[in-house]
A protein has these predicted regions:
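Short membrane-interface loop/juxtamembrane segments of multi-pass integral membrane proteins
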Residues: 23-26
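Alpha-helical transmembrane segments of multipass membrane proteins
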Residues: 49-53
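Glycine/charged-rich beta-loop-alpha catalytic/anionic-binding loops adjacent to active sites
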Residues: 29
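Catalytic cores of Mg2+-dependent Asp-rich isoprenoid enzymes
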Residues: 2-21, 35-48, 58-73, 78, ...
Length: 197
């Protein structure tokens, strides 16, 4: 069994499962702090488990994988807005909506207003900060951990694309070419940022 073979921490897997219970209901994400915890225990946990499988137990990477999970998770939250909004499920924290003078119903209306665009720009800015911090921390991390961070190459590419297309309708799904995905991963796997030292 994979858990035993790689000595994966069962408590981390349990938290991952427990946090995903939130996905089953239409309760809104209450605060940015709650989103931080959710993404840390879901997306961040996957990066931590991948690192554990690749190099074994590594000390002092929790901060690194937490930021990696936040960068990937925030960008995924934005990309999933069309699907989640159609299901009346909201992962954008209520306190962020309130700070921009928005309510849930305005998001569910699926109209790309300037206020919604500003709120999403703030989220993209946070994703950018977490991604930049992760890549900075990865430079000092043990070299074997870097391949486990390879999905961040897609986060970086998608974030650049989103930052360039600020006038795109956030409620229309943005399709990602499979060939472009493979090309991005192939190129990143050969770059110093993601290669073992």
């Amino acid at each position: 069994m994979t858990v035993q073979r790689f000595a994966l921490p069962v408590d981390r897997l349990t938290r991952l499962i427990d946090e995903h219970q939130f996905d089953l209901y239409n309760d809104p994400m209450p605060t940015m702090a709650a989103l931080d915890g959710y993404l840390g225990d879901t997306r961040g946990a996957l990066f931590a488990l991948a690192a554990r499988i690749v190099v074994g137990a590594v000390a002092d990477i929790d901060h690194l994988v937490h930021h990696a999970g936040l960068a990937q998770g925030i960008l995924h939250l934005i990309a999933s807005l069309p699907r989640d909004g159609a299901r009346r499920q909201l992962f954008i924290p209520l306190d962020l909506l309130a700070r921009h003078g928005l309510g849930q119903e305005q998001v569910f209306a699926a109209k790309a207003t300037p206020v919604i665009r500003a709120m999403l720009a703030e989220l993209r800015g946070q994703a950018r900060q977490h991604l930049d911090h992760t890549l900075e921390l990865a430079r000092e991390a043990p070299g074997g951990v870097r391949p486990a961070l390879l999905p961040l190459a897609l986060v970086s590419r998608d974030l650049v694309r989103a930052e360039r297309r600020i006038d795109a309708d956030p409620f229309q799904p943005q399709l990602r070419s499979r060939l472009a995905t493979l090309w991005t991963l192939w190129r990143a796997a050969r770059s110093p940022a993601f290669r073992e030292r």
